[in-house]
């Protein structure tokens, strides 16, 4: 009876251990080109937090990765994923990021893909609302944090040791990392230079890493592509001035219910709160935030990796921000500061901070849309073809 009971358990353990021991490089061939293409607009967290789909994408010169946060999901006819699908310029946008994906999350992701970033053109959209006084918090960090990428950082010898130490110290401030016993102890030992402890923890950490790696590989080969996306032909073969006119018309049609040029369905939900929000943000600013330190780490990683990024700095909805009392200085100081950081590294930047009051540039209070996407499309097109950007 005991043999019957323990036999399947022992067999399952042997099979599990065998699966973990198989080198992942043997299995990456199961990630098809079709699977990578499907994931380009799926906005699936399994891809953001993994390694393999992004690895395959970064190796392919026909993909242009676009990193950002919640604005990437605002898919409309002017969105880069639609525009460059119907206007073939030789590349396919690949979207990486979701709400709460801020500088530290992207730093971790870039560190995990340093060997694929050299000479790679990428686009990175920076959002002002990341730079609040407290910076990234647990609510936004935890759902986007990747234990696999966190462990990859610990074993990463390509990253500058000082940047690596800064990243580990910063990440140890979050409960999502603190509650991961193996990773948090490994980080602490590395930060404090406790070599004996690092060596003692490494075997368990490597088994843990291998388990997460196989899980990522499974997701990379089997997950569905998500809901079918509608492709609009309305932007095909149009000049930039024609696209601007079309975006104006679309924005006007979809935001006619309010004076803030906010998308009608969004404003419908916001409307009951509008009177209470008047003047509520007096004294606030985006000029002081720990996010600047996280952003600097990310810039350093991209610089060390030899990546070729174009940053897109988007504005806020000026009319709405004025209504809520958010001081203009608290916004302009941010624009100046973040653009200075980017340019100091020698990176290209499409600075759209001058469009706060441009109707239909923003789709709501903080997310780009309609005309804003047209400007972004133009900047991407110019950057991809010339390596430089003059759009603003």
From Swiss-Prot:
It is a single-pass type II membrane protein. It is found in: Cell membrane. The chain crosses the membrane at residues 5-25. Residues 26-392 are extracellular. Pathway: Cell wall biogenesis; lipoteichoic acid biosynthesis. It comes from the Bacteria. Keywords: Cell membrane, Membrane, Signal-anchor, Transmembrane, Transmembrane helix. GO terms for biological process: lipoteichoic acid biosynthetic process. This is Protein DltD. The gene is dltD.
């Amino acid at each position: 009876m005991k043999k019957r009971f323990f036999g399947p358990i022992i067999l399952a353990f042997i099979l599990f251990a065998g699966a973990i021991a198989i080198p992942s490089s043997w299995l990456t061939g199961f990630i098809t080109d079709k699977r990578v293409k499907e994931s380009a607009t799926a906005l699936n967290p399994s891809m953001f937090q993994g390694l393999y789909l992004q690895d395959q994408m970064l190796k392919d010169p026909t993909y242009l990765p676009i990193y950002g946060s919640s604005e990437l999901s605002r898919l409309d006819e002017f969105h880069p994923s639609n525009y460059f699908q119907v206007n073939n310029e030789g590349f396919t946008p690949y979207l990486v990021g979701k709400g709460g994906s801020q500088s530290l999350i992207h730093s971790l992701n870039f560190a995990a893909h340093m060997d694929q970033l050299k000479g790679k053109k990428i686009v990175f959209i920076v959002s002002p609302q990341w730079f609040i006084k407290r910076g990234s918090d647990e609510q936004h960090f935890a759902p986007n944090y990747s234990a696999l990428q966190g462990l990859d950082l610990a074993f990463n010898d390509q990253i500058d040791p000082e940047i690596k130490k800064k990243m580990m110290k910063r990440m140890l401030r979050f409960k999502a990392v603190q509650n991961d016993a193996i990773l948090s102890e490994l980080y602490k030992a590395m930060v404090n230079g406790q070599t004996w402890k690092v060596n003692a923890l490494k075997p368990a950490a490597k088994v843990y890493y291998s388990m997460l790696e196989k899980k990522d590989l499974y997701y990379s080969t089997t997950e569905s592509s998500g809901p079918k996306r509608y492709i609009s032909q309305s932007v095909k073969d149009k000049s930039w001035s024609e696209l601007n006119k079309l975006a104006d018309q679309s924005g006007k049609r979809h935001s006619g219910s309010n004076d803030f040029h906010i998308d009608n369905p969004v404003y419908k939900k916001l409307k009951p709160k509008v009177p209470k929000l008047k003047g509520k943000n007096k004294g606030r600013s985006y000029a002081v935030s720990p996010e600047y330190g996280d952003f600097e780490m990310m810039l350093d990683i991209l610089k060390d990796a030899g990546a070729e990024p174009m940053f897109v700095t988007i504005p806020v909805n000026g009319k709405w921000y004025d209504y809520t009392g958010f001081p203009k200085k608290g916004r302009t100081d941010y624009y100046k500061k973040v653009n200075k950081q980017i340019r100091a590294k020698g990176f290209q930047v499409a600075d759209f901070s001058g469009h706060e009051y441009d109707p239909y540039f923003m789709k709501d209070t903080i997310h780009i849309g309609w005309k804003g996407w047209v400007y972004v499309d133009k900047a991407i097109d110019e950057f991809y073809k010339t390596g430089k950007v003059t759009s603003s």
